[in-house]
């Protein structure tokens, strides 16, 4: 019965009733804004690699689970504009407090740079599977007398959608109509984004699924196919330092996918010495999440999130778990807490 329930949710998703949730939901986007906004490609001074697994709606058979691998880095980046908290470069002077914040202003005389990256995303919900790969590019242009940067980026790739009939349980008599759901589709996807960021803030916007592809795995709805809607994201955040050891990082994410109502995430993180952090995230009339993590060193960081529904879904599951592991390559400045820490 639970399998049929999951399949019913899937069918809603491809016939338009539930298509507002086409893309997987992550609560660790605060540690990997690159997932949502291609303009962040190459924002750091190093290659940033992240691996994450999300198990959603525990307690429900065949519940959704998602996996992603992302990697991106800069090209010809000579300044340290990505870091709000970092160690000084060798041979440079600067005052370092307990937060390892370099008072010498790294956001002066910024230079333009580029970034490239890529990602692999897998999303599974019972018999329904989605596997995508994409590449991204961004250009970061100094503005405001070279004290801030305005970046614009694009992500382009392919996604394979499929439905495995062998994972369904319809009894001994399988309807021939149902058996047609054996097909798979390979569709292109493009997203564009922009971000304005400075030493203590960022604001950005993204439009995803620009192609608004039509998906019909059965081949039965030709001429009446429902299309994937555009996803619109607005995001912003800042940092508030509380002395030399503590800092607060509030942020917000606004999402709109027609015909669903606007979704708003309000987030707050607190960090101690830029090594240990915890936070909460609230999605209006949908879910609340608790987040925690640590920066082990200048190479490895880990984040964990537990999300609990506040909608009617709370009656059918025991929450969602998400684990993220990050690796940093080419970190010549030994940065332990980069710009994305405020997401």
Predicted regions and their residues:
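Hydrophobic alpha-helical membrane context
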Residues: 14-15, 49
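Sec-dependent N-terminal signal peptides
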Residues: 4-14
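Subset of outer-membrane beta-barrel
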Residues: 21-343
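Sec/Tat signal peptide C-region and signal peptidase I cleavage site
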Residues: 16-20
């Amino acid at each position: 019965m639970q399998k049929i329930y999951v399949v019913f949710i899937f069918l809603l998703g491809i016939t338009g009733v539930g298509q507002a949730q086409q893309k997987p939901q992550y609560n660790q986007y605060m540690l990997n804004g690159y997932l949502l906004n291609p303009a962040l490609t190459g924002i750091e001074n190093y290659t940033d690699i992240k691996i994450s697994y999300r198990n959603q709606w525990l307690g429900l058979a065949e519940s959704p689970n998602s996996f992603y691998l992302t990697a991106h880095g800069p090209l010809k980046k000579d300044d340290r504009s990505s870091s709000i908290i970092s160690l000084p470069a060798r041979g440079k002077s600067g005052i370092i407090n307990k937060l390892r914040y370099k008072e010498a202003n790294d956001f002066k005389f910024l230079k333009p740079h580029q970034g490239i990256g890529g990602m692999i995303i897998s999303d599974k919900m019972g018999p329904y599977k989605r596997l995508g790969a994409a590449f991204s590019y961004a250009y970061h242009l100094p503005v405001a007398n070279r004290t801030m940067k305005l970046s614009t980026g694009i992500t382009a790739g392919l996604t394979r959608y499929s439905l495995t009939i062998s994972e369904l349980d319809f009894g001994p008599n399988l309807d021939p109509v149902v058996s047609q759901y054996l097909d798979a589709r390979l569709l292109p996807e493009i997203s564009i984004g922009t971000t304005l960021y400075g030493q203590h803030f960022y604001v950005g916007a993204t439009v995803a699924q620009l192609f608004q592809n039509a998906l019909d795995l059965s081949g039965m709805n030709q001429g009446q196919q429902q299309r994937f809607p555009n996803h619109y994201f607005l995001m912003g955040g800042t940092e508030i330092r509380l002395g030399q050891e503590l800092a607060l990082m509030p942020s917000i994410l606004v999402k709109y996918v027609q015909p669903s109502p606007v979704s708003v995430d309000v987030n707050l993180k607190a960090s101690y010495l830029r090594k240990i952090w915890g936070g909460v995230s609230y999605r209006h009339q949908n879910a609340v999440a608790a987040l925690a993590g640590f920066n082990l060193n200048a190479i490895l960081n880990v984040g964990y999130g537990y999300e609990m529904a506040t909608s009617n879904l709370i009656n059918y599951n025991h929450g969602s778990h998400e684990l993220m592991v990050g690796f940093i390559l080419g970190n010549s400045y030994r940065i332990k807490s980069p710009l994305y820490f405020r997401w």
